[in-house]
Every structure is written in structure tokens, then in C-alpha cells.
Curated annotation (Swiss-Prot):
GTPase activator for the Rho-type GTPases by converting them to an inactive GDP-bound state. InterPro entries: Rho_GTPase_activation_prot, RhoGAP_dom. Gene3D superfamilies: Rho GTPase activation protein (1.10.555.10). Pfam families: RhoGAP, Ubiquitin_RHG40_C. The record marks R425 as: Arginine finger. The modification Phosphoserine is found at S70. One of its GO terms (biological process) is signal transduction. Residues 384-581 form the Rho-GAP domain. This is Rho GTPase-activating protein 28.
Length: 729
């Protein structure tokens, strides 16, 4: 019997440990009520791979040629099954020791209507203003930055939400035109956009919106972007927003996607960065260019015959994955940790909108089930939410981004286990694992746990248990069905990478940072493959059941498909770990626009507030005029004091604390750092300080941005002239 999957785990030559079935017997997805490890006996959340019993294998929807089967793939399947059995045994053992609590019980899917899910989606992407009706600056600013595909995705969800509300509400009062049959205008001119938005492509002038220029071209840059309820004047400044009763959603612009910054397209590519820099062996000669400058959903929409792709063969060998050549623009590349917390929150909102629009382009609905929130434990280590662990750890180290206990597990394995054969296939000593778990829960936060006595095998076992027992999966399992549908349409690895890239950007901060550290750690394990026999395929096979789990009920066949896809996703994460956590530049451009729009909107007082506060404001202005001499604001004073093309860089931690630097088209961030290093090279301590220093742009249209050493500062200066420039760790 052969069960194969081109999208993840290769299921070949499966050998049942039970009695062999008669020849010709077909695999079946039967009920497992009689199985000793049935649902009732597993109090913990239902793992997506619990279905891999010896009698319930069923072919997934993917197929592979028989020539691709190998002994290695059969061994990988056996590893997968052993990991499932280990999870089942640990789950049963835990249930016998203590009764399940409400926090640990499986959360069942609640029957909810589509409107509730769309309302939750709108809240998750930062558009709760559309539900509450409040004129919030952040929501309006976010809407003003959306591309065509992103705006269409928001409109679609908002329409579903409003339609559901109308069905729930009582019969509305009949319109006078319904009574007398008056119809003076065609239906297309009816004014119902406050409750439902249509998908027409015709552009209409909106009341209260000032337009000063013709429609934007497709290659418009950031400097020519028109914001919702506002426009640019000829000098590039924004015209003040007009007050009125314009609905927030009416102002969603039908704008083209823009390149990052104002640099010409021909000059945008300064150098290339290949994933081969990080995985330098067994790379095929074919390579594909990967751009972060253009919205992925816009790129997919413009692809001809995107629904007629030929299915790509996904083989076991890691070297057959596409080699990507990444465009490195004049603004450099940005890691997730290079941006401020507030800006990363905006990135997360935009990424979820972009991910939804990306799947919409393929006709795939990004469905999410509404489940009961599992709170988890408030203390200890295992079963505690990542956010709670980080809150406790930040009392010791405010800068920590990955739970300290997880870092200890990594360190323990790296000390003596990287060359240990089958390090993540071994189960370790059960008695010791149980003892260490209890001691960690009781003593770790008090720094009383003795790490010297722990073996690397037990550390590896507890690392898997740590992720398996999280209240919620490290990676959202609800995205997997959409990823399965994407793979069934047969797009190449590049499209799969783009979907996965947006998934990573949409993760909560704690999950995203932890996942990055985990993938970096596993790549260290894979680097010692010749000694530990743990390659990319083995790691993804063993870790899939621990990193992805579902609290929803699925048939065994569905869960098999979910498991295979989860394995493939981990494999992609491991292969492209160095580039998946780089923020796409088109999202950074949208964040800059959003910050500019927020500052503009905050200057505008609602008409009612203006009316109520007019006398108070006039009195305050008169007092200021008589008591103080008008002074320039710090930003205007700074701009007037510093000539064009000259920036003042501050280095508060160095002996040379400030320096004015004349920029030219070739000045890079590393050149500025080199100048400060030369000026502060009098002592060895100053030299050590400079090794950890980076150049930041702070303020203006960005919260804080740690610049790539290869970024051209004049280009950054042009898109953010009001920023301050600071050198710090």
C-alpha cells in the first residue's frame, strides 16, 4: 500500500504494526470509538495528527510519482508515527495523574454566523472603527493606505458584516418611495454606501474629499500618494481635510500599489541577497527573483491564468526547493526587530489584510473558526501562554523577546546534543522528564532550578512538550486549510513562500519572535546532519505534531491532510528562515503613509468639537499672543538650521555625541558609523562600543527604524525629512 503526498510528508511504504490487512483491502476512514486512545481518553487538545492510527490511513489529495519513493521517505513516515504515539502516550499519562481542568480541556467550535467572524476579522486588522462607528484616526489612516486588492478585501468583509446585521435586526420602516413607487434615479445611484459597499470600478467624487490632481498612475511613488479625505498640493504637502458626513468606508481609495520610496525603479535594486548565502549546499542552477517592493496580492492579481498553474512536484530532498534572489533596494532590508512595537502592530494589521486579499485573488476564503479562548495557567512553565512567560521574564530582563526557559532548552541542546544521533527522535528517561517538569514549574521563576543535572535528551523532550502544551498553537492552525487549497491549485514555491511570509508577519509579537528563534535553533541542528542524522525533512516531520494542533473536530482523513501540510510549512520555514522574518518594503511604505495620515487627521477637529470649543480656543489664542513671542517648533528650527542634504547624527553613548554629515547619493549607513568610529577610536572601550552600534531613523513618518548598514541615507532622508538620526545599540 502506498499513500503519498506532494505537499508535505511523503507517505510511502507504510508498515502497520497491527495484523496485516487482506490484500486488496482499501484504506478507510473509520470511526475509532473502540480505539483505546479515543477522543474521550485524550483530555488535552486534539492534535491534528491523532488520527494516524494503524487502521485509518487514507490517501490525501496530493499525488507523487512512484519513482520518488525511497527508503528514506519510509523511515520519515515511521518517525512521524512514532512521534504521534509518543504524544498519545504522554497525553494519556497526564490524564491519569490529574483530572482535566477547564483551561486544559478541549475547546469546541461554537456555531457562529459569518457576520461574527467578519466582525472579529475587522477588529483583528485594526478596523474596529467600522463596527463601533467612531471616527478613530488610526482606522481612517489605515483605510487611506490600502491598495486596490486590500480595499476590496475589507469591503467584502464589511458587506458581509452589515448584511448579517440587517438580517438580525427588525423589519426596517418602509421607504416613502416604496409606498408611492417613486423612482427618479437608477438603482446604481442609490445612496446605500453607509451600510453596504458595492464593487463597482467607476470612480465617483466623494463629498468632503478634495481632489487636486488627476488619478494616480500605477507606478506612483510615496510622494504622490493621495490620502483618504485629503490630497496633495503641487508642492507635495497635504491639503487639509474637509469636515463633513463622509463615511469612513467611502474614503477607501482605489489606488495602485506603490513602490517603496521615491527612488526610480531602475535605481531601486542596488544588490541582491540570495537564500543560498544561508543554505550554501546543493542549490540548483535555477534561481528566481523575489521582490519585496510590490504587494503580493497585486502581483498575483496581475498574473495571467493564475488558476491554471501546473502542480509543482515537492520532493523530499531539501535542495530542490527554489533558490531565491532577493532584491535589496537602496533602503536596504528590514528585520522584524528593527521597527518599533507600534509600527510592528501596524505591520501585523496590514499583513492580515494583505494575506486575506492574497487568498481572495485565488478564490480561497480565509475562514477562521470561533473557538472558546483557553486561558492557560498563570504560573509555572508548561501550559502557560507565551505572553505570561515573557511578562515574568521581563522582570529580570526588560529586553527579552523569547521566553528564558526556551533559551535554556536551546542552550542545553547546543552544549552537548548537536552531534547526538537522533536528538529529537529520542524520548529520554520518562522518570527524569517528569521530575524536571515538576521542578521547572516550581523553581524556574525563582532561579532555583539546577540546569547542570539535565541531559540534552531530556531538554529536547521538554522542548517539544513546551510547544505541544501551549494553550494556543504557536502557528495559527486555521490558516492551514487555506494553504491546502492554495497547494491544490498548484502554484510554485514562490507563491507558497509569499503566503507563508504574510502569515509570519501576521503573527503576534511573542509567537513571531519565538518562532524565529526556534527555526534558527533547528537550522543549527540541521547543520550537524552528518553526525546527528537530523536533516530538514526529519526535523519538520517530528516537529509538525508539536507546533500545529487544532481544537476543532476533524475527520481522520482531514487531519492527515492538515498534518502533511503543516510539515511542509515547517520545511519552508526552515529553508527560508533568514528571509521570512524580513519585513516586506511595501508594508513599510504603507506604515509610513499611515503615520503621515494619522498626524494629519489629528490636526483636524470634528466640526461639533470645533463649535463647542470655539470660544475657549479663541481665548487661549489671544492669551498666547499677548504673553509669548511666537517661536519656531523644534522640527522647523531643525530644518532651518541644517542645510538641505545635511543631517545631524546623535550618538549619546559615545564620546563624540553629535556630528553634522553631508549626504550624497552614495552615503550608506555603514559609512556614517565608520566616521563615528574614526572620531571615537582613541580608546579600546570606544572601539568595543562601536561594534554594537546601529544607525536609527527616529520620528517623522516612522516610529523607530534600525537601518540596514547598506541603506543609502539620502534616499531615506528624502522619504522622511523630519526624522532624527541616532546611533545606539
Amino acid at each position: 500500500m502506498e499513500v503519498e503526498d506532494s505537499g508535505g510528508v511523503v507517505l510511502t511504504a507504510y508498515h502497520s504494526h497491527a495484523r496485516s490487512q487482506p490484500q486488496g483491502a482499501e484504506p478507510r476512514c473509520a470511526s475509532r470509538a473502540s480505539h483505546p486512545l479515543s477522543r474521550k481518553s485524550i483530555p488535552r487538545c486534539r492534535r491534528i495528527n491523532r488520527m494516524l492510527s494503524n487502521e485509518s490511513l487514507h490517501p490525501p489529495s496530493f499525488s507523487r510519482s512512484n519513482s520518488q519513493a525511497s527508503v528514506d521517505s519510509s523511515a520519515s513516515m515511521e518517525e512521524f508515527l512514532r512521534e504521534i504515539e509518543s504524544i498519545k502516550e504522554s497525553s494519556v499519562g497526564a490524564s491519569q495523574e490529574q483530572p482535566p481542568t477547564a483551561a486544559a480541556a478541549a475547546a469546541e467550535v461554537k456555531p457562529v454566523d459569518e457576520g461574527e467572524l467578519e466582525a472579529e476579522w475587522l477588529q483583528d486588522v485594526g478596523l474596529s472603527t467600522l463596527i463601533s462607528g467612531n471616527e478613530e484616526e488610526d482606522g481612517k489612516a489605515l483605510l487611506s493606505t490600502l491598495t486596490r486588492t486590500q480595499a476590496a478585501a475589507v469591503k467584502k468583509r464589511y458587506n458581509t458584516y452589515t448584511q448579517t446585521l440587517r438580517k438580525k435586526n427588525k423589519q426596517p420602516v418602509r421607504d416613502v418611495r416604496d409606498i408611492f413607487g417613486v423612482s427618479e434615479s437608477p438603482p446604481s445611484d442609490s445612496c446605500e454606501h453607509a451600510t453596504q459597499l458595492d464593487g463597482t470600478k467607476e470612480e465617483k467624487d466623494l463629498p468632503g474629499v478634495t481632489k487636486t490632481s488627476r488619478p494616480l498612475p500605477d507606478d506612483a511613488s510615496l510622494s504622490s500618494t493621495t490620502l483618504s479625505n485629503g490630497a496633495q498640493d503641487e508642492e507635495g504637502g497635504f491639503v487639509a481635510l474637509q469636515s463633513g458626513s463622509v463615511s469612513i468606508l467611502e474614503a477607501i481609495p482605489d489606488i495602485a500599489v506603490h513602490t517603496n520610496g521615491s527612488a526610480d525603479a531602475e535605481q531601486s535594486v542596488q544588490s541582491t541577497l540570495s537564500d543560498d548565502d544561508y543554505h550554501g549546499k546543493n542549490v540548483p542552477a535555477e534561481a528566481e527573483e523575489l521582490s519585496f517592493e510590490v504587494s503580493y496580492s497585486e502581483m498575483v492579481t496581475e498574473m495571467p491564468d493564475r488558476n491554471k498553474w501546473k502542480k509543482s512536484d515537492i520532493k523530499k530532498e531539501d535542495y530542490v526547493l527554489t533558490k531565491f534572489i532577493i532584491q535589496k533596494t537602496r533602503f536596504g532590508l528590514t528585520e522584524t526587530g528593527d521597527l518599533s512595537v507600534e509600527d510592528m502592530k501596524k505591520i501585523r494589521h496590514l499583513s492580515l489584510i494583505e494575506l486575506t486579499a492574497f487568498f481572495d485573488a485565488f478564490g480561497i476564503q480565509l475562514k477562521r473558526n470561533k473557538t472558546e479562548r483557553v486561558r492557560g495557567r498563570d504560573n509555572g512553565i508548561f501550559g502557560v501562554p507565551l505572553t505570561v512567560l515573557l511578562d515574568n521574564d521581563r522582570k529580570k530582563d526588560p529586553a527579552v523577546k523569547v521566553p528564558l526557559v526556551l533559551q535554556k532548552f536551546f542552550q542545553k541542546v547546543e552544549e552537548s546534543g548537536l552531534e547526538s544521533e537522533g536528538i529529537f527522535r529520542l524520548s529520554g528517561c520518562t522518570a527524569k522528564v517528569k521530575q524536571y517538569r515538576e521542578e521547572l514549574d516550581a523553581r524556574f521563576n525563582a532561579d532555583k532550578f539546577k540546569w547542570d543535572k539535565m541531559c540534552h535528551r531530556e531538554a529536547a523532550v521538554m522542548l517539544k512538550a513546551f510547544f505541544r502544551e501551549l494553550p494556543t498553537s504557536l502557528f495559527p492552525v486555521e490558516y492551514i486549510p487555506a494553504f491546502i487549497s492554495l497547494m491544490e491549485r498548484g502554484p510554485d514555491i514562490k507563491v507558497q513562500f509569499q503566503a507563508l511570509h504574510l502569515m509570519v508577519m501576521a503573527l503576534p509579537d511573542a509567537n513571531r519572535d519565538t518562532a524565529q528563534a526556534l527555526m534558527a535553533f533547528f537550522n543549527k541542528v540541521i547543520a550537524n546532519e552528518s553526525k546527528n542524522r537530523m536533516n530538514l525533512w526529519n526535523i519538520s516531520t517530528v516537529m509538525a505534531p508539536n507546533l500545529f494542533f487544532s481544537r476543532s473536530k476533524h475527520s481522520d482523513c482531514e487531519e492527515l491532510l492538515l498534518a502533511n501540510t503543516a510539515t511542509h510549512i515547517i520545511r519552508l520555514m526552515l529553508k527560508y528562515q533568514k528571509i521570512l522574518w524580513k519585513v516586506p518594503s511595501f508594508l513599510i511604505t504603507q506604515v509610513r503613509r499611515m503615520n503621515e495620515a494619522t498626524m494629519l487627521l489629528k490636526k483636524q477637529l470634528p466640526s461639533m468639537k470645533k463649535l463647542l470649543r470655539r470660544k475657549t480656543l479663541d481665548r487661549e489664542v489671544s492669551i498666547l499672543k499677548t504673553s509669548k513671542v511666537p517661536q519656531k517648533s523644534p522640527s522647523s528650527r531643525r530644518m532651518s538650521d541644517v542645510p538641505e542634504g545635511v543631517i545631524r547624527v546623535h550618538a549619546p553613548l559615545l564620546s563624540k555625541v553629535s556630528m553634522a554629515i553631508q549626504l550624497n547619493s552614495q552615503t550608506k549607513a555603514k559609512d556614517i558609523l565608520a566616521k563615528f568610529q574614526y572620531e571615537n577610536s582613541h580608546g579600546s572601550s570606544e572601539h568595543i562600543k562601536m561594534q554594537n552600534q546601529r544607525l536609527y531613523e527616529v520620528g517623522g513618518n516612522i516610529g523607530q527604524h534600525c537601518l540596514d548598514p547598506d541603506a543609502y541615507i539620502l534616499d531615506v532622508y528624502h522619504i522622511n525629512p523630519h526624522a532624527e538620526w541616532v546611533i545606539k545599540p
